[in-house]
Amino acid sequence: ALWKDILKNVGKAAGKAVLNTVTDMVNE
């Protein structure tokens, strides 16, 4: 279903954003 694909993409984007934030915090 289309909404499932959208949800998956949103989840991936959110996961990447969280990962980037954590990585930035660790690097500082």
UniProtKB/Swiss-Prot annotation:
<keyword id="KW-0964">Secreted</keyword>
<protein>
    <recommendedName>
        <fullName>Dermaseptin-2.2TR</fullName>
    </recommendedName>
</protein>
<dbReference type="GO" id="GO:0006952">
    <property type="term" value="P:defense response"/>
</dbReference>
<comment type="function">
    <text>Has antimicrobial activity.</text>
</comment>
<dbReference type="Pfam" id="PF12121">
    <property type="entry name" value="DD_K"/>
</dbReference>
<keyword id="KW-0929">Antimicrobial</keyword>
<keyword id="KW-0878">Amphibian defense peptide</keyword>
<comment type="similarity">
    <text>Belongs to the frog skin active peptide (FSAP) family. Dermaseptin subfamily.</text>
</comment>
<dbReference type="GO" id="GO:0005576">
    <property type="term" value="C:extracellular region"/>
</dbReference>
<dbReference type="InterPro" id="IPR022731">
    <property type="entry name" value="Dermaseptin_dom"/>
</dbReference>
